[in-house]
């Protein structure tokens, strides 16, 4: 039987694991292995990326986590006692196991966090189904007791874990990284196995891909702990053996225990978790009048249509009927109702709401339901840009709220659908080129001036890499070629560049789910905010409903201004301001764009000065063209139409500029 790595830390064991997801499965394939696990410390951030990468390499992905177990219970929080959590490896045998692991990891953050996200034995008892447990490294409870000379306690704890997870679902984990203590612990584990019949499994606590990568992992730990490489008391691994080893290397470590090695393959064969992508899991909306969702949706559209278009021109009603049929066929009726409901609530509370932005503004149904306030028919907007029956994809209304009161809308949604059904979305800060240089420079104990001199040779442009900087900067190449310390700095930074460094919260994204969010994705806590452990892109790929709740300071500014005006003109209403005010367009043409949404940057202000916009259509053309994609071929157009009316800019000129 083949050997399978069941204890592996990726780059998502933040500032600890140095195994890049993109290389992990490829390395396992190079070693001739057929399956591979991911078991990051207390988190599941990298699970989906790992799953996809493994599948792409023909490697069977095994989903897991090395959880932290509280010494007593998650309610106990005595410093020096309860913050010293024990390790336990959990692997998902099936979908039930995945849901249980997702729940356990989530509860570690939401209920058990004390220095680290912790679970306890009570939680494990309640959510053990579908999970296979391994006793973990020297930081596991059983190895700790063995190291303390408490053999009977170690044996009792092993039997307790076996009772929690069930027969053939708990394994005593043997490791050998050349550490004398570990070999002593292994002798105790072998004795427990002989006396209890508990099965053994051999693993390597892989934190990096090759022996040579141990230096990168050492640097990561220094970044994490704020230490330098010349500090003899820094936290560091004792040997360079914590890498993804070959089967031959593992068999050489445990020549007398082939069963422990073969059990890795037996466990891998039992682990069968598959993720389904682009299958949507939308929450249901409960209409307040007791009707079904479709009836309520059509009623809202019909009533809104009569209100919006008392004298509807020809074709408008047909457009609404078409949109309603598409929304129904594609299964997004509840989505429209959910969005309309929280926008209605926000407006009732006096929370400033944007008039509509993005492709959703092209929906007449959304306009009739007061989701948007711009008439798509007046501006000839296309519904299929938002929902296309020939290209099934999740719709996405961009909803903007006053920056100061956005949280109230999220609280309303949580109250309506349940706190465990709503979460915000994680983002990751990564070590960009300049940041990697500065981090590694500190760790190498270079002076600030030395590190800063190197960092300043890296252009401050988006997505700049060290390789690209070396290609375009002769000064940087000279520094690297003339100073071995600088070469070491740059080479080390290249090894870490792009790795995740920290987590944050997405500025707008909110997930609403039919079942508790942790049934689908694990959760974490960023400060006081509950977030998914998967990024926005992954959330959408898993078919979950992602809403954009963007807090805009521009709406706050407008609301403050309107309140000030109403002190002198009580009837003032922003909605009654004309769209074609000549004085306003003159100000924009003069470059007075401070505080104007999407027109504030120096570049687009210059375009406004050049173009002299005279209508909403002109502004539409400017905003549409001034973006990374179409901007380059349209640069000449935006320079050479300084005083044209809306028609030549938005129609004839745009067609001339098409590549």
Across the structure, where does each feature detected by a protein language model lie?
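Alpha-helical scaffold/interaction cores of sigma-54-like transcription cofactors
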Residues: 1-659
